[in-house]
Amino acid sequence: MGRGRVEMKRIENKINRQVTFSKRRAGLLKKAHEVSILCDAEVSLIVFSHKGKLFEYSSESCMEKVLERYERYSYAEKQLKAPDSHVNAQTNWSMEYSRLKAKIELWERNQRHYLGEDLESISIKELQNLEQQLDTSLKHIRSRKNQLMH
């Protein structure tokens, strides 16, 4: 038997709030995965905890490709809605700023992953990709080192 509806307001007790976030985050990630499988949809989900920790899910393709696709789509939509050239210029700069900021955040996140940090939030497929990239990099480094030594 279900517990009934929960009133939608901030949970004041910090521990209860953290437990609820953890459980609901897991459920949300599971639902995103289910939608991607059942509906053959490309799904991406980004969640930041109140402490700023990133949790993400992306079906099939990597998050970077989905974000780039979203940016292109958003940019095209805004271009269609803003006929005034001054508004277009301001929108273009705003979009470029947002795009570059997102790219920097993505690079910083990738750098943390390469350093072995924040790995809890990425999928097994992304972990395998990361491992393959690191293996390839290590082979290049060893090859270059051997060239210099001989």
From Swiss-Prot:
BP terms from Gene Ontology: cell differentiation; flower development; positive regulation of transcription by RNA polymerase II
Domain K-box: 90-150
UniProt main location, coarse: nucleus
CDD domains attached to this UniProt entry: MADS_MEF2_like (cd00265)
Keyword line: Activator, Coiled coil, Developmental protein, Differentiation, DNA-binding, Flowering, Nucleus, Transcription, Transcription regulation
Subcellular localization: Nucleus
The organism's place on the tree of life at top rank: Eukaryota
TM stretches of this protein: none
Residue intervals of the MADS-box domain: 1-61
More info: This is a truncated version of CAULIFLOWER that may contribute to the 'cauliflower'-shaped floral meristem (curd). This trait has likely been selected by early farmers during the domestication of modified inflorescence structures.
Subunit structure: Homodimer capable of binding to CArG-box sequences.
The name this protein goes by in its record: Truncated transcription factor CAULIFLOWER B
Organism this protein belongs to: Brassica oleracea var. botrytis
